[in-house]
Amino acid sequence: MGERRDTTVIVGAGHAGTAAAFFLREFGYHGRVLLLSAETQHPYQRPPLSKEYLLAQHSTPSLLKGKDSYARADIELCLQDDVLSITPASRQVKSSQGSYTYDHLILATGSHPRFMATLGQADNLCYLSDWDDAGRIRQQLGEASRIVVLGGGFIGLEIASSACKMGKHVTVIERAPRLLSRVVSEAFATFIGDIHLGNGIELRLGEEVREVRRCTSGVRVDAVFLSDGQLLECDMLVIGVGSEPRMELATAAGLACASGVLVDEHCHTSDPFISAIGDCVAVCPSPGHQLPRRESVQNATEQARLVAARLSGRPVPPVQTPWFWSDQLQARINLAGERPAQGQVIVRRYGGDKVSMLYLQDQQLVAIEACNMPGDCLLARRAIGQNHSLDLARLVDADVPLKDALHFA
């Protein structure tokens, strides 16, 4: 009789879960790897859903891995296999297709859009979470001419950008007094907002949708009432007001949860045989010190690599500088590092729609916000956290290449 193989079950086949499966093999893990997905599609890239796909540049999902890659890597991909419950005491997962016993479980359940129950449902009221949602939005965009987007974060602005490129009249409504209030500085948000305004997108900041008006049949929204009483007619309403972690399974299993599934810096949950990664987690490196959830492909990949290395007995890789990107209209936005609450800001203006905002603390570069300057962001990522020497006099001069100001050869 052959020796029993360890089994790692991964719940969720988004960026984090799929990356974890392949990193396990890359790091020499010889156990059984099961990757469970409730979706019908092979694991696919999420970022294009709010951009290229809506513009009909993609008719099928951009897959994370080729369909035959899973069998070649000895990864058991189980599609349309919705996990129903987890029983930590017996280390069992019950799903719509059966049950699995695990030696280690990785939760990569992701997040879902924050729903606005007060607005109800309608055929042309849309949220974006997955491939099916994107298909519905694309269909509605093809029929609509006046689009209202509720939410001035990245998802809302990316969808607004796609609609604008299609020649639609777009209004973005944001309850905060500025765009991107949770993720970028006010100055950078203003810069990005000006690009949207310059392309004809209407921005209604400091406003909320109080209620919707429906057509006679009641199945479609034809207008929204704002908090100031104004009525905006529309053919389509897209809601992008943030996300919530999918942690129902974790909560029901008795795992510690708060604003996400709580994990330490090595992605251990409160159960020693369960890890959690990606958009569903909130890192709590020490008691009472919970970090904000990070929702990005880079973070999902880094956490997947970390857990796979740990389960494979490999050295845990060093933490990388966090980074993020977004495409909006003619703007390529790149962010890296952690913007400090206080510190020095250096703005390098290159003219037109190009700018880099560098954030220093104790004479060290700690973050960058860049628009249409991806090279600056790559250089900054190399310098952040490296105790790198800076030439402040040259750093403030946009005519001096950033490479030279950072003393890179």
Swiss-Prot record:
Broadest EC class assigned to this enzyme: oxidoreductase
Q: Might you give the EC number(s) for this enzyme?
A: 1.18.1.-
Q: Name one GO cellular component term.
A: cytoplasm
Assigned keywords, A-Z: FAD, Flavoprotein, NAD, Oxidoreductase
Chain positions recorded as NAD(+) binding sites: 151-159
> What Pfam families does the database record attribute to this sequence?
Pyr_redox_2, Reductase_C
Q: Which GO terms describe its molecular function?
A: oxidoreductase activity, acting on NAD(P)H
Binding, FAD: 7-38
Q: What is the annotated signal peptide range for this record?
A: none
Cofactors per UniProt?
FAD
Question: PANTHER family per the record?
Answer: APOPTOSIS-INDUCING FACTOR 1 (PTHR43557), RIESKE DOMAIN-CONTAINING PROTEIN-RELATED (PTHR43557:SF2)
Q: Say what the protein does.
A: The oxidation of alpha-terpineol by cytochrome p450-TERP requires the participation of a flavoprotein, terpredoxin reductase, and an iron-sulfur protein, terpredoxin, to mediate the transfer of electrons from NADH to P450 for oxygen activation.
Protein's recorded name: Terpredoxin reductase
Q: Which organism is it from?
A: Pseudomonas sp
Q: What is the gene called? A: terPA
